[in-house]
Amino acid sequence: MKNKNSEQNTHSTIGEQDIHYFHEGKHIYAYEFMGAHKACEEGIEGIRFTTWAPNAKSICVIGDFNYWQVEDKNYMEPITDAGLWSVFIPNAKNGDKYKFVVTNKDTNHYVYKSDPYAFFSELRPNTASIITTETQYTWSDDKWLEKRAKTNYYDNPMNVYELHLASWKTKNGKFLTYDELSETLPQYIKEMGYTHVEFMPLHEHPLDASWGYQPTGFYSVNSRHGDIIGLKRLVDKLHNNDIGVILDWVPGHFCKDQHGLIYFDGSPCYEYQEPTKAINKGWGTHNFDLGRNEVKCFLISNAMYWINEFHIDGLRVDAVSNILYLNYDREDGQWIPNIYGGHENLEGIAFLKELNGVLKHTCKGVITIAEESSSWPDISTPVEKGGLGFDFKWNMGWMNDTLRYISLDPVYRKYHHNLITFSMVYHYSEKFILSISHDEVVHGKKSLINKMWGDLWNKYAGLRLYMSYMIGHPGKKLIFMGSEFVQFVEWREYEQLQWQVVDQYESHKQTLHFFKKLNDFYHNETALWQCDYNHHGFRWIDADNSQQSILSFIRSSKDNKQKLIFICNFTPVTYYDYHLGVPDAGSYKEVFNSDNLEFGGSGQVMATEIFSSLQSSHGFEQRITIKIPPMATLVLKLIK
């Protein structure tokens, strides 16, 4: 089995070792010989096509090179009894469109299929695969990759900007190309202070409204924005601006459009044989058979493909619950228990462990993130310690609780105080990322600003309060595009964000400025990210002040030299002469205040130093007396 770290092979030899590892489910570079590859055989140049279809009677390759005619010379030959087929076509070349005509051995019914391993495809609604052999790119991100391999992300800042390429910005109503995005996106993300961008799926998908989560071409770069080289240039540019690239990846299920993976050889192939496991009624898709060796090769090789060929720094694995549970989104009687009588998908569990094990062993510094909403234990525990092996898990519980809390009238917040504090009860059980993702601003859930309580002033203040509370809470961060400049309408995948409001309204400009300052503050303060997953990094001052809806806590660096005190006031009331216990005697200074005038707040700031006094409060021997602005987060720092 080959083990390479960069560009694709340009020869077609399929060795016995490759075949063996493929059928054993252990090949992690299957894309090097599966699909369409440039070849020179007996001195003749052409393309070798290879696919897997165990229940096929015959497979013919049709395309531009043979006028889309079924011809004897273009039929594939079986090269194993387990379903590998291959053919060399001399006059096929880079840029030619093609499909497979697959005839089932039991029914003689034939279907026209796109190549599962195609590197590029036609723009929807067309569905042909495109021979793509000219993919070489000279990267300039060596320094980034060297740094990535040495980085421990647990004790470094991670502030992720989640992005849907098609609707971030457009040009005259049309999609921006990868090259056009390279001119603006890296600079914007860098200026705003985000450390990573997370792209929603970039593999080919037929329906725009699926946002990429119902893919057909797992190896095929989204053709709406250009070609492979363009995407590589975009990633390279991001890396050269010190921005990591995370990709949403969908290994659990696939689109059921007829040209795709569904019943690829006329029978269940990539999906489970058992319909109750294969058919995903909730999403209208089919679930991958994660216990089948060749399917595991397809998926793990796909992860390796994006990481090796496009220098992707992390995979956010979508819908992990659908992989873990046999009864996910199914009523009683709609699922079959495992061999032990449980609802756990044993094959899915084994697949996730194998995936994470492979990536840890072969891809230094690459992270995996689980989008998972259940209480499944040890998701971010290493495989060798009994876990699934992810590096991080989205904290869906924190997101649901806090968004519910922030939407309440402050009069009633004291009765629901646990919603804003409960997350710290379980925080150290996983390596959590606090995520406010695309899922929270669609389908009638309202935009982030419209989740806030009150009139316009209180909505803006509530947003600043909430985001600065989020920055102070342990865990890495993720925010969806548009929230940073206060898009009032829900996200719409069919049009660009409402960037015009930044120029039209001062409040939007001020909030964009607030996000930039908040991100810079986060990045510059070691205490906010160095001990996210260590009890030393967080301590409550007062978690129980439900009557006034005020939270106060301490964030600390590893060496304890940096301490930040957060005070979050979730009411529109200014509190004067508020006594707060502090851990150290000395002078404290306000270092961040979400109520600052420059952010659109009321300007209730403390410009002078605050000195502690030897009076006990909140379990500390020292206390300070401060003014707490309305609907705001105040951050203090010990300076001497």
Curated annotation (Swiss-Prot):
Q: How does it assemble?
A: Monomer.
Q: Which residues form the active site?
A: D318, E371
Gene3D superfamilies for this protein: Glycosidases, Golgi alpha-mannosidase II, Immunoglobulins
InterPro entries cross-referenced by the UniProt entry: A-amylase/branching_C (IPR006048), Branching_enzy (IPR037439), GlgB (IPR006407), GlgB_N_E_set_prok (IPR044143), Glyco_hydro_13_cat_dom (IPR006047), Glyco_hydro_13_N (IPR004193), Glyco_hydro_b (IPR013780), Glycoside_hydrolase_SF (IPR017853)
| Protein name, as recorded | 1,4-alpha-glucan branching enzyme GlgB
Entry's family note: Belongs to the glycosyl hydrolase 13 family. GlgB subfamily.
The terms describing its cellular component in GO are: cytosol
Reactions catalysed, semicolon-separated, are: Transfers a segment of a (1->4)-alpha-D-glucan chain to a primary hydroxy group in a similar glucan chain
Superkingdom as given in the UniProt entry: Bacteria
One of its GO biological process terms is: glycogen biosynthetic process
Pathways involved: Glycan biosynthesis; glycogen biosynthesis
Q: What does this protein do?
A: Catalyzes the formation of the alpha-1,6-glucosidic linkages in glycogen by scission of a 1,4-alpha-linked oligosaccharide from growing alpha-1,4-glucan chains and the subsequent attachment of the oligosaccharide to the alpha-1,6 position.
Q: What is its EC number?
A: 2.4.1.18
Q: Gene symbol? A: glgB
